[in-house]
Amino acid sequence: MNFDQKGMKKRSITVAYFFENIGRNHDIKLRRLNRVDEQKRRISERELHRPGLALAGFTNLFTYKRVQILGNTETRFLNNHDEAERRKAFENLVRFKVPCIILTSTNKLQPELLEMATEAGVPVYATRHSSTKAMYLITDFLDDQFSLHQQYHGSMVDVCGVGVLLTGKSGLGKSEIALDLIERGHGLVADDVVIIRRKGESLVLNARRNDIIDHFMEIRGLGVVDVKANFGIRAIRDIKDVQVVVELLEWNRETDYERLGLDMKSIKILGVEVPLVQLPIFPGKNIAVIIEVVALNFLLKHYSNYVAAEALTERIRTSIDKGNEQDDES
């Protein structure tokens, strides 16, 4: 499995896509205030901007490529001027190709200003949320859209609450093992194509399915399996953090595999270190049970800082020390 890929980022999204999708996974509803061609306007930056200085006439450093937020301060500034001055101030904003304007806290735009925005082709929206909350939710949505992401071949399963990514060469039985885990009560996130995202500088990796493949699986000799239809809603997950990578390997008698678990391996995915467990495959080995133990070991270390190999090593060391003391006394 090649995890050395740097990942990809979207360069931009249309304002139409932004308007249609932001309310799906975020608690914010935008109301359209004018009718313009939203496909022609694009958002290319995750940061937002409050154009107070631009409205006042200082546009030298105006970051017009960002979504423009008009809150209480900006709307009151406009309302405190007569119509001619309002138009002049608002012209400083709409003469640039801004992606869109969002009014927060149920603020309203004067009809003549809304007409100016429409003539300039600038979409205008309104939300009941305060500027602080609206900016938080919009930034979170744009963070997700412009996050580093990459597709990987494998299976992603929620095992005992731990996100486990199964990888390995094609034909080793990743899907079959994932199906076995599902039958044992765990949840499928994605099979065959796993999309992994990293938001900004976060060290958390999110895994999700390909929308076309959804929660279908291909099992050799059987065909396509609809996990949701066969096992019910409990057997699927929409998204899960990648917490452990389990790499399935072909058994090789000459290879020296880890036996104690003292040598903890890791692998970099999109610049984030993730614990790696390598499991050799051979007939008769119950991989599903072993993966459950991998997940439980992760939880033990995460919550209790307990590692079985270290505990056993300490017991042996203590026993040897006691034996040496008894020899010295005799």
From Swiss-Prot:
Keywords: ATP-binding, Kinase, Magnesium, Metal-binding, Multifunctional enzyme, Nucleotide-binding, Serine/threonine-protein kinase, Transferase
Keyword Magnesium included in the entry's annotation: yes
Active-site residue list: H153, K174, D192, R259
Region (Important for the catalytic mechanism of dephosphorylation): 280-285
Disulfide linkage: none
Region ranges (Important for the catalytic mechanism of both phosphorylation and dephosphorylation): 217-226
Example of a GO MF term: protein serine/threonine kinase activity
Cofactor dependency: Mg(2+)
Reaction(s) catalysed by this chain's protein: [HPr protein]-L-serine + ATP = [HPr protein]-O-phospho-L-serine + ADP + H(+); [HPr protein]-O-phospho-L-serine + phosphate + H(+) = [HPr protein]-L-serine + diphosphate
Pfam families to which the protein is assigned, alphabetical: Hpr_kinase_C, Hpr_kinase_N
Binding site for ATP: G168, K169, S170, G171, L172, G173, K174, S175
The enzyme's E.C. designation: 2.7.11.-, 2.7.4.-
Residue sites binding Mg(2+) per the record: S175, E218
Signal peptide: none
Any one biological process term the GO annotation gives: regulation of carbohydrate metabolic process
Similarity-based family: Belongs to the HPrK/P family.
Function: Catalyzes the ATP- as well as the pyrophosphate-dependent phosphorylation of a specific serine residue in HPr, a phosphocarrier protein of the phosphoenolpyruvate-dependent sugar phosphotransferase system (PTS). HprK/P also catalyzes the pyrophosphate-producing, inorganic phosphate-dependent dephosphorylation (phosphorolysis) of seryl-phosphorylated HPr (P-Ser-HPr).
Self-association state and partner proteins as the record states: Homohexamer.
Note, other: Both phosphorylation and phosphorolysis are carried out by the same active site and suggest a common mechanism for both reactions.
Name of the protein in its database record: HPr kinase/phosphorylase
Gene that produces this protein: hprK
